[in-house]
Structures are given as structure tokens and as C-alpha cells.
Amino acid sequence: MAQQLDNAENKKASSNTSKTDLHTLTKRQDFILASRGLKHSCETMIVQINKNDLGTIRVGFTCSKKVGNAVVRNRAKRRLRAIAREALPNFGRLGFDYVLIGRYGSTVSTEFKTLKNDFISALETLHLKSKGEA
């Protein structure tokens, strides 16, 4: 039994440095810093990125009251979280903060596949821009 716990702890420790381990932005200051970085707007969402010195991928989600009532905002954020979980391990880069902002109507009503494609194309565009600035 103790050996199983040790193995579980080792797996957990090794996954902390993985690219699939997404850290969530929670502090207002982190969101403000991300807003000063590069932005890409599309019909379904706004994506903001900014470099961080941590060497990890951090992601934040926000939806204003313009998106709808609490139920609609939470549904939009759930969809954005699902997209980030699927796309960032493959298309995100270590050392960047990402903020996904939901848009009125379209974040909730658009097909999931379309949302994901919009997010991936936004990431590719923003990473090309970030290379040009460096």
C-alpha cells in the first residue's frame, strides 16, 4: 500500500513540470499584465497573451456581464476552459500567460469545433506576432 502511494506521489511530482499542466490565473494583477500583451479578436472570443518568467503555461478566463446572466457566463467559461485544456498542450508555449475572454452570444452558441479552431488560429497568429517583436 505504501509503495502505491509513493508511486502516485512520484507521478504527481513528475507531472508538475509537464506542458499539459495548466496553471490558472487568479490574481487581478496577472490579468492586467496579460492585457498589456498581444491581443487577437475574433467573433467568438478575445485571446490575450503575454510572456511570463515562470516557464509554465498559465491561463485565465473571464466573461463580463455583457455576456449574460451568471448561468450563461459560467457556461461560456466552462466552454473556454475545455478548449484551453484541449488546445494549449499542443499549441501553447511554455513561458506565456493566456487570457480567454468570452463574447456576447457567440461563445455560448457557436459549435465547439468552431470555437476550438478560432482559438488555435488566434494562438498561431499571436505567436507569430510575438516572434516578430522579439
Residue ranges of predicted features:
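Positively charged, solvent-exposed patches that mediate nucleic-acid binding
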Residues: M1-A134
